[in-house]
């Protein structure tokens, strides 16, 4: 999977010392994957990981029937005799109120991303997906070791059922930010046809990360994984809804839900998403999610955090938010248009949409990418980065709303790898020229770049409220 598709190699642009370009370049390539090995394991593209997690080719519509929606029912079992329990487990306990509530939220999170609907079965109706607890091992002893198990779609009695060890406290109270919610979502994934990313199982003895098929088999990339995200550089203690590879996998099986959050949705602080895992209520709330969003003009609002953050609006990439690493991502195919940073020193990278990016307080680095972006640095010494001419075309220019001379800088060093970019009063037609034109009526500087030597400038940025000078520009 090509995540970036840039035409400019920025690695050498930052070689002469610190520039904002260096930070942008690092974030572009943060957790890039699918190119060679990481350690002794191959790195998988999104498509390879998706196919690995769906390698059983099982759906509720039949074997190898992909992309077709499914209307499923669920129920909470009320009683099961020991002789009738699956895999010879014993000691049935029905779901408590907390489990029922959290299960409905977990089901909802799967329905958000794929064309599966869930409705509670009527009394006496055999549900597609059934939930129950167990407490005893097959030999009748108290089970203090296992966590849970679930069965794939099928046509036998316990196909599509999920079972949880009631002796585990986090299964009894599977709240958000607790492992029990992760377990619920994981087991529901099995009932929908998702496999572990590798050929391992808790019943296989003592499997470990050494047994993975590919390097990204951790909970950073898939809630179906057994392995801690620390193996791949994350540090956020697991998802509570589908992760990037899971979203791609479940959408392969049932199709993408294109009616999910088609309005203007805010994720993070001031969230209107209606989902607990997308919502931060205070600076101590960890945000751990991979967002699927089908439309609208949407915003990442991470304004309540004081830690330095790295926020990427590029589909398929990860962000460091709220002091944790790689715990927010955007699922492939989803578009988030806007970002608001916090009071730390943030790096924010936009995408090809018309982005609104607000760095907040702190010394921030902002990069809008393509589109007619509106960039606000906020308080602090900010750097506005441009990497190639399509970042701010003269036909669709960016606007920097609050440039402060002597504090902020504009970084054009990516254009100047040959050290031939020069400031002039008027274009000569030779190319690689910059004109700074102060417009007293609009109270803004128009920064024009003429790279090709043609009659029309290739690049324009409008800088509000500042009579820009060459010393304000990093070349």
Swiss-Prot record:
CDD domains: ZnMc_serralysin_like
Residues where Ca(2+) 7 binds: 378, 380, 382, 408
Active site, per annotation: 187
Subcellular location: Secreted
Binding positions (Ca(2+) 6): 371, 373, 391, 398
GO cellular component: extracellular matrix; extracellular space
Broad class of the protein's primary localization: secreted
Reactions catalysed according to its record: Preferential cleavage of bonds with hydrophobic residues in P1'
InterPro entries cross-referenced by the UniProt entry: Hemolysin-typ_Ca-bd_CS (IPR018511), Hemolysn_Ca-bd (IPR001343), MetalloPept_cat_dom_sf (IPR024079), Pept_M10_metallopeptidase (IPR001818), Pept_M10B (IPR016294), Peptidase_M10B_C (IPR013858), Peptidase_Metallo (IPR006026), Serralysin-like (IPR034033)
Record flagged with keyword Glycosyltransferase: no
Swiss-Prot/TrEMBL GO biological process terms: proteolysis
EC number(s) recorded for this UniProt protein: 3.4.24.40
The organism's place on the tree of life at top rank: Bacteria
Hemolysin-type calcium-binding repeat start-end pairs: 340-357, 358-375
Domain notes: The Gly-rich repeats may be important in the extracellular secretion of this metalloprotease.
Protein name: Serralysin G
UniProt source species: Dickeya chrysanthemi (Pectobacterium chrysanthemi)
Gene from which this protein is expressed: prtG
């Amino acid at each position: 999977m090509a995540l970036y598709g840039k035409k400019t190699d920025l690695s050498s642009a930052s070689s002469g010392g610190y520039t904002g370009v260096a930070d942008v370049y690092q974030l572009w390539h943060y957790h890039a994957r699918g190119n060679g090995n990481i350690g002794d394991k191959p790195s998988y593209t999104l498509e390879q990981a998706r196919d690995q997690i769906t390698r059983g080719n099982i759906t509720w519509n039949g074997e190898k029937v992909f992309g077709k929606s499914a209307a499923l029912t669920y129920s909470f079992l009320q009683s099961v005799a020991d002789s009738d329990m699956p895999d010879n487990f014993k000691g049935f306990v029905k779901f408590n109120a907390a489990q029922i509530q959290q299960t409905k939220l977990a089901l909802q999170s799967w329905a958000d991303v794929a064309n599966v609907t869930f409705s509670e079965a009527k009394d006496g109706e055999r549900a597609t997906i059934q939930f129950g607890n167990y407490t005893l091992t097959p030999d009748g002893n108290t089970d203090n070791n296992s966590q849970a198990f679930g069965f794939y779609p099928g046509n036998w009695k316990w196909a599509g059922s999920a079972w949880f060890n009631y002796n585990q406290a986090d299964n009894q109270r599977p709240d958000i930010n607790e492992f029990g919610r992760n377990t619920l979502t994981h087991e529901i994934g099995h009932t929908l046809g998702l496999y572990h990313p590798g050929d391992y199982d808790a019943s296989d003895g003592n499997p470990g990360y050494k047994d993975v098929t590919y390097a990204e088999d951790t909970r950073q990339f898939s809630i179906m994984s057994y392995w801690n995200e620390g193996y791949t550089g994350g540090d956020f203690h697991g998802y509570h809804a589908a992760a990037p590879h899971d979203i791609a996998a479940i959408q392969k099986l049932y199709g993408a839900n294109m009616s999910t959050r088609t309005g203007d949705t805010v994720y993070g602080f001031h969230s209107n998403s209606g989902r607990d895992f997308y919502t931060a209520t205070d600076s101590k709330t960890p945000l751990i999610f991979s967002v699927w969003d089908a439309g609208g003009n949407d915003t990442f609002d991470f304004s309540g955090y004081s830690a330095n953050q790295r926020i990427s609006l590029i589909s398929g990439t990860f962000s460091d938010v709220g002091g944790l690493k790689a715990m927010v991502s955007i699922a492939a195919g989803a578009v988030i248009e806007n970002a608001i940073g916090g009071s730390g020193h943030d790096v924010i990278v936009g995408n090809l949409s018309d982005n609104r990016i607000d760095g907040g307080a702190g010394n921030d680095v902002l990069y809008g990418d393509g589109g007619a972006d509106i960039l606000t640095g906020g308080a602090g010494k900010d750097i506005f980065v441009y990497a190639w001419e399509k970042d701010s075309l003269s036909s669709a220019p960016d606007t920097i709303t609050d440039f402060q001379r002597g504090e902020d800088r504009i970084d054009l060093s990516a254009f100047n790898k040959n050290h031939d970019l020069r400031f002039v009063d008027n274009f000569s037609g030779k190319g690689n020229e910059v004109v700074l034109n102060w417009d007293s009526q609009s109270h803004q500087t128009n920064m024009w770049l003429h790279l090709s030597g043609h009659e029309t400038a290739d690049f324009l940025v409008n800088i509000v409220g500042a009579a820009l000078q060459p010393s304000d520009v990093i070349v």
